[in-house]
UniProtKB/Swiss-Prot annotation:
Signal peptide (residue range): 1-26
Organism of origin: Oryza sativa subsp. japonica
Protein name as catalogued: Alpha-amylase isozyme 3B
Family: Belongs to the glycosyl hydrolase 13 family.
Function: Important for breakdown of endosperm starch during germination.
Amino acid sequence: MAKRIASMSSLLLIALLCLSSHLAQAQVLFQGFNWESWKKQGGWYNFLHGHVDDIAATGVTHVWLPPPSHSVAPQGYMPGRLYDLDASKYGTGAELRSLIAAFHSKGIKCVADIVINHRCADYKDSRGIYCIFEGGTPDSRLDWGPDMICSDDTQYSNGRGHRDTGADFGAAPDIDHLNTRVQTELSDWLNWLKSDVGFDGWRLDFAKGYSAAVAKTYVDNTDPSFVVAEIWSNMRYDGNGEPSWNQDGDRQELVNWAQAVGGPASAFDFTTKGELQAAVQGELWRMKDGNGKAPGMIGWLPEKAVTFIDNHDTGSTQNSWPFPSDKVMQGYAYILTHPGVPCIFYDHVFDWNLKQEISTLAAVRSRNEIHPGSKLKILAAEGDVYVAMIDDKVITKIGTRYDVGNLIPSDFHVVAHGNNYCIWEKSGLRVPAGRHHY
């Protein structure tokens, strides 16, 4: 009897380990704000709190929330007093903590938008330059002076800091992340966001502004469960203004960063976004590279790629690099069934009324246990059609072509479809075998 109990206990332990491993892999990120969210009457945190159930129903595992601190710009991307959460235009610190607790009650982890490349000062120094920073506490934490600004940021620096390790940000002082006090106090602040506020991970804003080695320092010092960096890489374009077919240099930058930082660090797959939004306009041949793989970061390092259709910068009211609006669901059909970690944008679920279609695709992903490292086999990539099989369990078709011939095995059945996309899986509603037209 004791042996049977021990055996059953071992089997249960193995099952739990397998389940936890799967849950750790099966990630779907949701961006819980847009560029105008700060304007919401009654506060964005309170508004979003009322939609936690709706967001959970889409099947997401993580929600990305806006920058939490005081900021000169209302959206939060020009931060000043980092510990001052009550000065945020999105709501108070108490409202933020309540929102995070509500997401946690649904099993959803919360990712903070971390803006540390640059920082806005409260006061001028003797030179008349804004470079005296306040941390937002009664003590001296994050109370910095010009010594903490990169020496080559000559508009603000006193010349005593280290040179910048990344790209320049002209609108505010670039912080010297090689300064040991800066590293210590920012790490302490991040750990406070975890232990006191409740955040689980980080989205690193403008991560090109400091080196991967600097990012690694903060990741190692704070042990987040999820990290994704914004590295808006520069795609190559041909003379006609169209994206080049080969974007290896673009995606190599993303791969290099993720590998250098290590641990849980991933990067937004800007390469896939650029290729996909060009491809859905009659150029679906773009979605297979010279080695038969996906052309974006997911073709090389899918486990560290976060795919997306639009965000608060590329879409929303900024609209700086938008996905074709009439083809957004083709984009979601791709990212929600393919390797990588897909990110769903708030606007598309709520403002565009695409919640049901997106939720259906997310359910296909969950039901078939598609994960960041899932196996991708591209069956067709031509101008008007793209067909791919994922983990031998799901087939995705996007494009205008009506007849996909015999590419769909007879034991696959339609489980989702919409404007110029269709999804099949090995279980579900049975349809007649033979040729398929969608």
